[in-house]
Amino acid sequence: MRNVLYPKLAATNIKKNGKTYFPYLLTCILTVMMFYDLLLVSTNSALDTMPGASQLRLILNFAVTITGGFSAIFLFYTNSFLVRQRKKEMGLYQVLGMDKTNLTKMMVWESIYTAGAGILGGILAGIVFGRLIFLVLLKLIRFDVAFQFSVEPEAILISAGLFGAIFLVILIWNIFQVQRVNPVELLQGGKKGEKEPKANWLIAVIGILLLGSGYYIAQTTESPLSAITKFFIAVILVIFGTYALFTAGSVALLKLLKKNKAYYYKTKHFVSVSGLIYRMKQNAVGLANICIMSNIVLVLISATASLYIGQENIMNTRFKTEFSATSDETTPENIQAMERIVQEETQSRGLEIIHEQKYRYVPLSAMKYDNQLKFDTDSGSGYDADAMRGLYVIPLADYNALEGTDISLAPDEVLTYFPDEEFDSGEIVLGKETYHVKENLKESNLQKKKEADVTKNIYLVMADDAAVEHVIQLYGPTKIPITMQYLLNFDMKGNDTAKSEALESMKARMETSGEVQSCYVEYREAYAQEFYGVYSGFFFLGIFVGFLFLMATVLIIYYKQISEGYDDKDRYQIMQKVGMSKKEVKGSIHSQILTVFFVPLLMAILHVTVAFKPITKLLLVFNLSDTHLSMMCTIGVSAVFAVFYVIVFAITSREYYKIVK
């Protein structure tokens, strides 16, 4: 009889607490399903047949890790709401005669039901939707592949093992919570409030300083290279600043509202403000969590959507021309062989070469400070990402041939071209030597003005080959010897099929036939499918992980409203008994929700607005230079999220009102 009691009691408890348990169970099922399907897709052998398979698999494996890690944190966090709501119930069981051993047995069965439903339901849902999810990925990549769908025992075992361990840790924690308190504390657990916190202005000021510092770093980041590190520093500062402002700043704000008699002594404001002050320490952390998670959803989805939608822009940024060949063998014979192959392959197919660039150059890097270019090989020259420039040194003869000019230079004279910034000095210091600037070029076929690139570029035209070699000596020794290279870029006009054939043939002849020495060829068409795979994988990752964080945000809002409702139930009933009408009670509820629950949304949108500049710099690392597209994606995602947030608010506030009335 006793063996049947605990399973029945556990099932009854779950059913009775359906308002809090069923959303949790649904979340468990969806979380397990997402993890299982990501694992299934990432280990599917069909991925190996796709272009960019290694990068795509790396992205998917990263998504699996993120999903697994966040699932543990998320389920543990949401479980705390369930425990808090059930403390009074647990205390009542002890008063009625159940000891802590009996409670433990009941909780074990509740965990078995919860874990069983979550894991089994999630894996079954994953099996049902797994094929659909893989087909969505293929659709995003624009690639057809034979996909053999099968139930993978290994994926099932890994999913069941991971989430089984998560639920076991949650059970142990729940048992510890019940074992360490007495029945009286449990009976008060559901109602237990906190002492009215004082307005901690020090923490509030620290929060403002942290937030301001994060915002300042975000707005002063100029280089995409520095954005990689600075953005994450800014994110950490903003996260800590957000928590500090919500925990201390919110209390300070409510205290100011309380001092504002015109606002505070209105019926609908009086109850909500005083109640929120009383429990703000606990509320503030939950609201900060909602803000941070909302921010993650907005940034993740808008950034990956920008990459996916802007793939054409990415291709144009990465590949300035249809064909590009580079060789570090710059003998006249080798250069002539490259040009001969191009001529033969294009003329035989009736293609016309346009936008041609061909010249020798030395690729270097330097840090620019005013009119000084410091090499990173110089002793004492630390790495400065904001000052870093791509430096291309070109012999005058090649420049004259490219531009059709007849300029002459003395050994200590140079032509300078700064396509990405202004430069008007008459001298330029290169390493330890000073050169006179004969002309600062305003336009050049070397590169278009303000052309998007990860680093800003500088072009220096030197008097002759000897002057170029001298610059290499100034640069100093490197692990890989620096040599002059020959660049051959061009577009073609003609039939698309003929273009494809010519591109493929030129690549094969220059790289593998032996006609040309030490040559590397790349062309847009060859890498298009690989790029689609990588950036579609990012979008797939953004949707999946973004949905996971969105689900967490919704559940936290829901539980926050439910727990607030139970906390306020007695208080509002007392208010109705002393004369407040239902309309006044509802007005007070809306005052509380509008004052507090929309603050996380507004703060998240503010964070995204400030973060937009460094995000566009980071996207440039991925070759996306279309800022307008990024802005439209961010605005669109923010608008959709705001509408979704309002819908969640409407549903949860209705549940809140049902509880308190």
Residue ranges and their predicted role:
Residues G18-A46, Q55-K88, S111-A125, I239, ...:
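Hydrophobic alpha-helical transmembrane segments of multi-pass inner-membrane transport and secretion
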Residues L40-S54, I123-I156, G212-T229, P600-K661:
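Short helix-loop junctions at transmembrane helix boundaries
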Residues R2-V4, K8, R180-E194, Y566-D567, ...:
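Short cytosolic juxtamembrane segments of multi-pass membrane proteins
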Residues Y113-L257:
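Hydrophobic alpha-helical segments
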Residues M1-V32, E196-W201, L210, F246-S294, ...:
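N-terminal Sec/SRP start-transfer signal
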Residues Y21-L25, N61, I156-G161, W201-V205, ...:
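Hydrophobic alpha-helical transmembrane segments
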Residues I314-S327, E333-M551:
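Basic-flanked hydrophobic alpha-helices used for secretion and membrane insertion
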